[in-house]
Amino acid sequence: DNVRGREMVLTPGAAGWTSKAVDLPDNATISIASASDKSDKAYLSVAGFLAPTTLWAMDAANPAPTQVKAMPARFDADGLVVEQFEATSSDGTKIPYFIVHARDMKKDGSTPTIMTAYGGFEIPMTPSYAAITGKLWLERGNSFVLANIRGGGEFGPAWHEAGLKTKRQIIYDD
């Protein structure tokens, strides 16, 4: 969902399919760690900018997940927030980006910021836990930006192809 992980339980019924969201952390990357076609149970791996990889157990009959195990936190994320915005590229396309910063950060351009982006080989750049960035950069009141530029795999083949060959300049514009 706009580069933000979502997990849904889909259930077939007489009138079609119904969906119910699974309550997991926002602004995260969610992966299925284990599942079976013989069971309604699954394990999910969840990681975000402010939380290390965590294993969650869930059952489709009761989509309230249970935390099983988490990697240790390597920096203090208290007082930090993650927001997602969109910038407008040179051709009018909306380019999503995440910004991780102190909750009380002044939005006046004065906060030192590391910005990263990668638009190539259909590789998506999704939220991930970076202990060194957190410890040495975010804990000192600085901010971090991840831009989801074209050429990557965040929105499928068309997003990737929009930055290929003669259209390569567009990823720099993004």
Describe the function of each predicted region.
Residues 12-15, 60-61:
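Short loop/turn segments that connect beta-strands within beta-propeller blades
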Residues 1-2, 46:
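Conserved beta-strand positions in repeat-built beta-propeller and related beta-rich domains
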Residues 1, 9-12, 88, 152:
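Compositionally biased, low-complexity repeat tracts
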Residues 18-23:
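A short beta-strand motif characteristic of beta-propeller blades
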Residues 3-11, 50-57:
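Structural motif
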Residues 30-174:
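Serine-hydrolase catalytic core recognition
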Residues 6, 14-17, 80, 110:
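Intrinsically disordered, low-complexity regions
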